């Protein structure tokens, strides 16, 4: 695992350098923060997870396994949040509610000081909207993600997702989500 994390970080740095060199000077593009949607792996709490955090933060965007979650996996998330003081963001939790066991474990995890980041696409589809809205309301720290991978098959769609949150949960809820995002991406003074 150590080698794969190190290799990933090197590839990310090279890609970021290429991106920065392609952006014209004085561009009005948003700030780009190096980060990772880190896939859960056993023992990750012992492998310097801060290297996978959003740059200069303690925010760890964590993708849980696409399987039935175990007690050990849930315990690792608790250790990352409570003992190691990471701001854990469970990304696209709606993908893991395929079983009542995972749904129950997700509800347990949502009681911890962590965030749930629901994909905007989930809110834009009638068949998944209700679950996405319920997950946003389940956590004290709701977030909206685009899960954008390209401009065709998985394009950015935050505008539509934000509008759905505004319509269904209200302007104050959307403002709180924006504040959560600002807080979790703001540089932290001390790295624990």
Show where each model-derived region lies.
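Mid-to-C-terminal alpha-helical segments outside catalytic/metal-binding sites
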Residues: 158-192
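Short acidic/histidine-rich active-site segments
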Residues: 140-156
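Short loop-to-alpha-helix "cap/lid" segments that border enzyme active sites
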Residues: 110, 126-134
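Short, glycine/charged-rich beta-strand-loop motifs at protein surfaces that mediate ligand recognition
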Residues: 94, 119-124, 148-152
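Residue-level preference for long, well-ordered alpha-helices that form the structural scaffold
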Residues: 8-12, 154, 170
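Short active-site-adjacent structural elements
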Residues: 124-128, 151-156, 185
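Extended substrate/RNA-proximal surfaces in nucleic-acid metabolism proteins
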Residues: 3-117
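Conserved, mostly hydrophobic/aromatic
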Residues: 92, 147, 181
């Amino acid at each position: 695992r150590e080698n794969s994390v190190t290799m990933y970080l090197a590839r990310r740095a090279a890609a970021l350098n290429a991106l920065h060199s392609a952006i014209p000077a004085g561009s009005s593009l948003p700030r780009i923060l190096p980060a990772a949607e880190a896939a859960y792996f056993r023992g990750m709490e012992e492998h310097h997870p801060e290297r996978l955090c959003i740059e200069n933060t303690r925010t760890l965007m964590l993708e849980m396994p696409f399987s039935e979650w175990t007690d050990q996996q849930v315990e690792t998330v608790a250790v990352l949040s409570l003992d190691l003081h990471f701001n854990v963001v469970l990304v696209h939790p709606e993908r893991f509610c395929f079983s009542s066991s995972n749904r129950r474990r997700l509800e347990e995890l949502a009681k911890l000081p962590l965030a749930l980041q629901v994909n905007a696409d989930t809110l834009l589809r009638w068949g998944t909207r209700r679950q996405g809205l319920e997950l946003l309301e389940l956590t004290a720290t709701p977030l909206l993600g685009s899960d954008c991978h390209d401009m065709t098959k998985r394009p950015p769609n935050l505008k539509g997702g934000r509008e759905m949150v505004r319509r269904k949960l209200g302007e104050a809820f959307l403002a709180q989500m924006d504040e959560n995002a600002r807080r979790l991406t703001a540089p932290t003074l001390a790295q624990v």
